[in-house]
Amino acid sequence: MVSGSKAGVSPHREIEVMRQSIDDHLAGLLPETDSQDIVSLAMREGVMAPGKRIRPLLMLLAARDLRYQGSMPTLLDLACAVELTHTASLMLDDMPCMDNAELRRGQPTTHKKFGESVAILASVGLLSKAFGLIAATGDLPGERRAQAVNELSTAVGVQGLVLGQFRDLNDAALDRTPDAILSTNHLKTGILFSAMLQIVAIASASSPSTRETLHAFALDFGQAFQLLDDLRDDHPETGKDRNKDAGKSTLVNRLGADAARQKLREHIDSADKHLTFACPQGGAIRQFMHLWFGHHLADWSPVMKIA
């Protein structure tokens, strides 16, 4: 069972403790291996590189707000399955045939360090591990496990991350409308946020209306998250290649930074309203969301170390 917030513990400290529990669980899922097992080594290094862990953190916070009654190991398995999926998608996104990135999470990308073939195989290995984790979750009835697997597979597939990356590769240089950009942003970013919250809702036996409202929240949160990422494209502390959006039709490039920041705030306000209905008795996600975006929107300050 997920406990509530502890009295006297700052939100920042609590997030750090939760993130450490996620990192520890990930390390256990991908133990250190013989240096000759290059694919397993690439999987572990890709996952264990310093990351924000936003997705698994949100899952733990959502479990608190939704009054999840299962075990913490099961919840961590579900959360880490999503993080493995996210990391696999980053490995593929960074490939020379796609974004051709050299830096990720402050370190050389997987294909730069291990080669392209290893990066592809490592991403497949991570996806396999992710689905296996959910399928083997002992605390959940079989029907719920199947629903959770379906949520994640749909988010990853040809109507999810795959389509989003295809559009980003082929349409980003075009003069896209704002709606077209928003659609691609949802597929690239928002759809995995939606899937992970649905997985927590399934594990928490939440009502259909709650799940529907969480989906609406994820739509707005994902758009805000992508806008923040685009606004920080040239920021030196992202741990990624800088100015990768030059020449692309992002909302920031199309509307300007000030208008994009205003659009971001509108998405946060809308997401907050959805949370009021989805989690009326819990405020863990809401507090995290406002802390996270508030600090970054204020002055791009790196002071908030949950970044």
Swiss-Prot record:
<keyword id="KW-0808">Transferase</keyword>
<feature type="binding site">
    <location>
        <position position="86"/>
    </location>
    <ligand>
        <name>isopentenyl diphosphate</name>
    </ligand>
</feature>
<feature type="binding site">
    <location>
        <position position="52"/>
    </location>
    <ligand>
        <name>isopentenyl diphosphate</name>
    </ligand>
</feature>
<feature type="binding site">
    <location>
        <position position="93"/>
    </location>
    <ligand>
        <name>Mg(2+) 2</name>
    </ligand>
</feature>
<feature type="binding site">
    <location>
        <position position="226"/>
    </location>
    <ligand>
        <name>(2E,6E)-farnesyl diphosphate</name>
    </ligand>
</feature>
<dbReference type="GO" id="GO:0016117">
    <property type="term" value="P:carotenoid biosynthetic process"/>
</dbReference>
<dbReference type="InterPro" id="IPR008949">
    <property type="entry name" value="Isoprenoid_synthase_dom_sf"/>
</dbReference>
<dbReference type="GO" id="GO:0004311">
    <property type="term" value="F:geranylgeranyl diphosphate synthase activity"/>
</dbReference>
<feature type="binding site">
    <location>
        <position position="104"/>
    </location>
    <ligand>
        <name>(2E,6E)-farnesyl diphosphate</name>
    </ligand>
</feature>
<protein>
    <recommendedName>
        <fullName>Geranylgeranyl diphosphate synthase</fullName>
        <ecNumber>2.5.1.29</ecNumber>
    </recommendedName>
</protein>
<feature type="binding site">
    <location>
        <position position="189"/>
    </location>
    <ligand>
        <name>(2E,6E)-farnesyl diphosphate</name>
    </ligand>
</feature>
<comment type="function">
    <text>Catalyzes the condensation of farnesyl diphosphate (FPP) and isopentenyl diphosphate (IPP) to yield geranylgeranyl diphosphate (GGPP) needed for biosynthesis of carotenoids and diterpenes.</text>
</comment>
<dbReference type="GO" id="GO:0046872">
    <property type="term" value="F:metal ion binding"/>
</dbReference>
<comment type="pathway">
    <text>Isoprenoid biosynthesis; geranylgeranyl diphosphate biosynthesis; geranylgeranyl diphosphate from farnesyl diphosphate and isopentenyl diphosphate: step 1/1.</text>
</comment>
<dbReference type="Pfam" id="PF00348">
    <property type="entry name" value="polyprenyl_synt"/>
</dbReference>
<keyword id="KW-0414">Isoprene biosynthesis</keyword>
<feature type="binding site">
    <location>
        <position position="105"/>
    </location>
    <ligand>
        <name>isopentenyl diphosphate</name>
    </ligand>
</feature>
<feature type="binding site">
    <location>
        <position position="55"/>
    </location>
    <ligand>
        <name>isopentenyl diphosphate</name>
    </ligand>
</feature>
<feature type="binding site">
    <location>
        <position position="188"/>
    </location>
    <ligand>
        <name>(2E,6E)-farnesyl diphosphate</name>
    </ligand>
</feature>
<feature type="binding site">
    <location>
        <position position="99"/>
    </location>
    <ligand>
        <name>Mg(2+) 2</name>
    </ligand>
</feature>
<dbReference type="InterPro" id="IPR000092">
    <property type="entry name" value="Polyprenyl_synt"/>
</dbReference>
<comment type="similarity">
    <text>Belongs to the FPP/GGPP synthase family.</text>
</comment>
<keyword id="KW-0479">Metal-binding</keyword>
<dbReference type="GO" id="GO:0033386">
    <property type="term" value="P:geranylgeranyl diphosphate biosynthetic process"/>
</dbReference>
<dbReference type="InterPro" id="IPR033749">
    <property type="entry name" value="Polyprenyl_synt_CS"/>
</dbReference>
<feature type="binding site">
    <location>
        <position position="99"/>
    </location>
    <ligand>
        <name>Mg(2+) 1</name>
    </ligand>
</feature>
<feature type="binding site">
    <location>
        <position position="93"/>
    </location>
    <ligand>
        <name>Mg(2+) 1</name>
    </ligand>
</feature>
<keyword id="KW-0460">Magnesium</keyword>
<keyword id="KW-0125">Carotenoid biosynthesis</keyword>
